Amino acid sequence: MRGGGNMQQMMKQMQKMQKKMAQEQEKLKEERVAGTAGGGMVTVTVTGHKEVVDVEIKEEAVDPEDIEMLQDLVLAATNEAMNKADELTQQRLGKHTQGLNIPGM
């Protein structure tokens, strides 16, 4: 049974890390990040779980003659917000997996 204590210690560390990561995931639900486009004419806000919670469109962004521009602005703001959510998740969870070679983390 050599090395059994080492394995037990490693399992305890993994359980501790799992618990911390679960807590961070819970916090991410509440965190908000925003993406903007068109100089702030469109703002999309998402949670750390990438759930869209708000879309703001300033009046000057609405041109009935150019709906495609508004669509592009909404798309760009959404993509920026999603990228920020990914970065936030990496910051929060990455500190717990640093130095570990876990696929997908």
Swiss-Prot record:
Residues 1-40 are annotated as: Disordered. GO terms for cellular component: bacterial nucleoid; cytosol. Pfam families: YbaB_DNA_bd. It comes from Staphylococcus epidermidis (strain ATCC 35984 / DSM 28319 / BCRC 17069 / CCUG 31568 / BM 3577 / RP62A). Homodimer. The keyword Cytoplasm applies. It is found in: Cytoplasm, Nucleoid. Belongs to the YbaB/EbfC family. One of its GO terms (molecular function) is DNA binding. PANTHER family: NUCLEOID-ASSOCIATED PROTEIN YBAB. InterPro entries: YbaB-like_sf, YbaB/EbfC. Binds to DNA and alters its conformation. May be involved in regulation of gene expression, nucleoid organization and DNA protection. The keyword Cytoplasm applies. Keywords: Cytoplasm, DNA-binding. This is Nucleoid-associated protein SERP0115. Residues 7-16 have a biased composition (Low complexity). Residues 21-33 have a biased composition (Basic and acidic residues).
